Regions:
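Internal metal/ion-chelating core segments
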Residues: 101-168
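Inter-helical turn/loop elements of alpha-helical hairpins
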Residues: 1-46, 50-62, 88-100, 129-133, ...
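Alpha-solenoid helical repeat scaffolds
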Residues: 31-34, 69, 103, 141
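Asp-box/WD-like beta-propeller blade repeats and closely related beta-sheet repeat scaffolds
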Residues: 65-69, 75-78, 83-89
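Flexible helix-coil transition and linker loops at the boundaries of alpha-helical arrays
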Residues: 32-46, 73-75, 106-116
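Structural register within alpha-helical repeat arrays
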Residues: 10, 51, 85, 123, ...
């Protein structure tokens, strides 16, 4: 109950769903997260996630993205921070930012990284959204080899098939 990051995750997850009725859920999570931050020591990553939630609730999703990018500067292998940056960029329509953000951290998602497949799925989606269909397909299929349940990677590959008129 005193872990600020858990409350930030709850709030950011509620906002990602894009439902008006969940804004109050996010706001309550933010209030609790801020109280937790004041009560004890928090890591830099934890503070950044809380700052991202607070910024988005104040109407600044771009600032929330910037805080996730700050978290990635601390640890480029932080796949969940990468996915959150990617997701908020998707919501605001920043297709080139989606691609660049993932490209910046792929060096840390090496072959032995347990979440590499999901990172490849995000990379594939960013590539597809910026018109690089051949590379998007290659990255998406490669990601699906290790993350069979990655709906986002599968979504990226199906977008490629649709955009290249290969729907059969």
């Amino acid at each position: 109950p005193d872990y600020a990051l858990a409350h930030a995750v709850k709030g950011l997850s509620a906002l990602m769903l894009g439902r008006r009725e969940l804004v109050e859920v996010a706001a309550q999570a933010n209030r609790t997260a801020q109280t937790c931050l004041q009560a004890g020591a928090a890591t830099a990553r934890e503070r950044l996630w809380c700052a991202a939630l607070d910024a988005w609730l104040r109407g600044h999703p771009s600032v929330a993205i910037a805080r996730m990018e700050d978290a990635l500067l601390l640890n480029p292998a932080d796949t969940i921070s990468m996915k959150l940056s990617h997701g908020i960029r998707f919501i605001i329509g920043d297709n080139h930012g989606m691609r660049r953000s993932v490209e910046r951290v792929m060096h840390a998602h090496t072959e032995d990284h347990p979440l590499r497949g999901y990172a490849l799925g995000c990379l594939a989606f960013g590539m597809e959204e910026t018109g690089n269909y051949a590379e998007a397909e290659r990255m998406g299929l490669q990601g699906l080899e290790t993350a069979l349940d990655d709906a986002w990677g599968l979504h990226a590959v199906t977008h490629v098939y649709d955009m290249t008129h290969r729907t059969k």
